[in-house]
């Protein structure tokens, strides 16, 4: 090996040999660690001391996105013990392999069909809309979203008289519902086949704590809540952008979504779905489609944020109050129609959900007294605690 000159701290030039690198040369063929069986009768395994060169490491790191690798965690109710179920195959396990989301149909005004790895739906009956806050309508399907995943309802319809708000579905037994905001001052009917959309399931991703700034810890479903810090007053027909003191650093292959909560979808407020870019403050745009002033109390959960390893895109809709539509990619997780699945037997009925929503809405309307102004104030503040 040739010698080289090195500059020491004492500023004296001395001759020294090039230290031997623990990595291979760039031009050498990359080799992996291999296992070789010993010739001895003990059958011990000896690891061949072979390293991997830097070029191979860089190429492997660029081709493989380590943060998109997700292993489904099994909860206590999802674990399948073969010792307790002898003689049964994997087909009877709580979650099929490869992973597919179990679902079943329910009587409703919608027709649901399985289309590749998504559930496509459209209305088969006329849907009547009024100016009053209507009870959400079931989409006619119940599904079980496993832990570590989330679902999203994406609507393909865009009309000047109404708007269908997307919804994030947490990891549990779910009965997706339709939330429609009437943009007209009169009663109207939505003809069959007008409302159509898809339901997709995607993996959740929880960034490291050092990647998040001023974000509270997520809930058990890996959703982050975004709350207002002060009172917001939005005039009739006005649009206001609400910023939250929260941000996150760039993470390769990660996408963040912000979607409004259902409490606002049932009112005359439209919270535009947003793709949260890294290095920017979280924010949502709120549109007041009513003829009254709306007051949002402090510490009110306006939207929920979720991180995923799939890329979502925007579809601008021009002058429509929705502003933009989120277009999800093709999910990797499919569905399987298993009406007799054990996890679907405990699904709450849509009627029970509607009753609970109505009770919560009645209590939230009495949370605070109206403000004395010339306009009518509709308070959508936090819900009061339930007293026995």
From Swiss-Prot:
Residues 77-88 have a biased composition (Basic and acidic residues). It catalyses: dUTP + H2O = dUMP + diphosphate + H(+). Keywords: Hydrolase, Magnesium, Metal-binding, Nucleotide metabolism, Virion. It is found in: Virion. Its EC number is 3.6.1.23. It is an enzyme of class 3 (hydrolase). Signal peptide: none annotated. GO terms for cellular component: virion component. One of its GO terms (molecular function) is metal ion binding. Its cofactor is Mg(2+). Involved in nucleotide metabolism: produces dUMP, the immediate precursor of thymidine nucleotides and decreases the intracellular concentration of dUTP to avoid uracil incorporation into viral DNA. This is Deoxyuridine 5'-triphosphate nucleotidohydrolase. The gene is DUT.
């Amino acid at each position: 090996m040739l010698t080289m000159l090195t500059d020491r701290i004492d500023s004296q030039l001395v001759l020294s040999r090039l230290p031997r690198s623990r990595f291979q040369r760039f031009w050498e063929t990359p080799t992996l660690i291999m296992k070789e069986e010993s010739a001895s009768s003990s059958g011990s395994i000896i690891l061949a001391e072979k390293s991997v060169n830097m070029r191979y490491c860089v190429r492997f790191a660029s081709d493989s996105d380590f943060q998109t690798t997700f292993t489904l965690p099994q909860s206590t109710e999802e674990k399948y013990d073969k010792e307790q179920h002898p003689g049964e195959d994997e087909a009877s396990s709580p979650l099929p392999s490869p992973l597919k989301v179990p679902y079943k149909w329910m009587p409703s005004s919608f027709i649901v069909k399985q289309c590749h790895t998504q559930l496509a739906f459209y209305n088969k009956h006329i849907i009547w809309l009024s100016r009053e806050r209507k009870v959400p309508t079931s989409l006619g399907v119940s599904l079980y979203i496993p832990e570590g995943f989330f679902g999203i309802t994406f609507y393909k319809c865009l009309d000047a008289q109404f708007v269908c708000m997307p919804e994030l579905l947490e990891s549990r037994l779910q009965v997706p519902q339709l939330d429609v905001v009437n943009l007209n001052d009169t009663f109207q009917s939505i003809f069959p086949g007008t409302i159509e959309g898809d339901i997709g399931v995607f993996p959740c991703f929880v960034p490291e704590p050092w990647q998040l700034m001023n974000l509270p810890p997520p809930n058990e479903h890996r959703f982050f809540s975004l709350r207002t810090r002060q009172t917001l007053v939005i005039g009739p027909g006005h649009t206001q952008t609400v910023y939250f003191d929260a941000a996150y650093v760039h993470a390769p292959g990660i996408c963040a979504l912000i979607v409004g909560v259902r409490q606002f979808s049932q009112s005359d407020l439209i919270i535009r779905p947003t793709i949260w870019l890294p290095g920017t403050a979280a924010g949502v745009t709120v549109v007041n489609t009513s003829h009254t002033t709306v007051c949002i109390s402090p510490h009110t959960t306006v939207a929920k944020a979720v991180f995923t390893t799939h890329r979502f895109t925007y579809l601008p809709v021009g002058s429509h109050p929705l502003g933009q539509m989120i277009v999800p990619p093709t999910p990797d997780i499919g569905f399987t129609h298993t009406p007799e699945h054990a996890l679907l037997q405990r699904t709450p009925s849509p009627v029970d959900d509607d009753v609970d929503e109505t009770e919560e809405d009645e209590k939230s309307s009495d949370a605070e007294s109206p403000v004395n102004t010339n306009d009518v104030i509709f308070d959508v503040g936090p819900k009061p605690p339930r007293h026995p």
